[in-house]
């Protein structure tokens, strides 16, 4: 039994009121010198037909020893309680040792779903220090939510789509000297850097890259195979880092996963009359919320990160019906 429960039980024994209600009325004093817990006796003034200071003094005189409480003091209309620090430390350590890894767990979440997105690495690029804060904080939140009784869903929203993969394919086909599965991510990065160096001298290479990405979009077997190999290689390498960090995910659905889901989002926005066109770009006007507009389609018809993010949020809500 915790201190608040013991205090509430002691007051209940003197007043005949419900301990649960009394516990809810307990407060934390603004100054530690005033105690660790404070009971506002004005709550009892109507029932006991006495002034709060008189009630506080009466309770202080009638309540005996309370386990975990060193002393109590009537102060104005409050009855202040001072915790027995030695007993508190001993009891806490006993609970920690007894509960082990489950210490602090609760059923607060009631099994409800919570989505936590973290790490979100880029394919064909190494895991670096910039990914570490999101990965560590996100995984901590994931574990905390699980301990609180939620069904946490860890999501690694991969950066696995875009013309950069067309560039990667061009670079690999020109200068790659072994099968992709035998490469390292750093070797892929070197090829990618070389592409940009060569493209400055030969701009037509950018057209090749766009053509290869178009092949990925259209499902060309060779293009999709290479793209998938880049993805598999990256996840294999970064998986070793995640294992060392004790990080896990339930979903690796990234940008590519939402490519075929953005059309429905755009249609829904249009049907609801939320889209406007400004200088060729299609956007949602958010001026009523004192926010800049959210661009959904560029003037050339291309989607943006915001478009994918909307598709991801809607998909996750429909799939997981998350509460957070």
Q: Language model features by range: what are they?
A:
Residues 1-18:
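Generic start-of-chain signal for non-secretory N-termini
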Residues 12, 18-43, 47-324:
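NTP-dependent nucleotidyl-transfer catalytic core
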